[in-house]
């Protein structure tokens, strides 16, 4: 994540541990939430102080359960921990009564129609309390944008008007191993199995029992309801793109230039 309070050095770990220990020692209790990375899961002492200081959860950039996709995103911390240990890491964080808010990105070149079910299975098996999923966004002048542009796959390039599409809620490039319909079907599968009201309520009931922290469970419940609407909007954007014909025209152009 961008605002990683835990960091990646021994000095950083000690600073964070001392901060939350200081809050606990002084009787300071404040509901709070922070952004960090998976490597925090091994630091039980810090996690304990975080919970006692009022932390309700942490956001962690999981991004993908595909190793090649993680390499393409330079997610070094996740690769060092290895995907096999993701569930163990999440379980240990939740053991301290902290909700885990994961983020996932769809639209990588390695994504296939099977990716969406694999991700849903992982989210449910790992008991991730909140999962926010978005579409890979090729921000201007990034290596990703330059690569997609060089391959003639970008189709939202009429700037400044097209800046509105450069969020994680819009598709701006031709997909690699998916048709647009497969992508929409996959996103809809995620919505039905992660963001439905029934699933959100079920996760809330489980979180109350498993984390033994009502504040954390309520926090996750509220965020999930918010993201239910956000993800619905993402789906609407994809359907509007399909109806406009812009994607099919971009695909035809891409295929013609490949010949």
Over which residues does each language-model region extend?
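Active-site groove signature of glycoside hydrolases
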Residues: 1-6
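Membrane-proximal basic amphipathic "stem/tether" segments
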Residues: 204-259
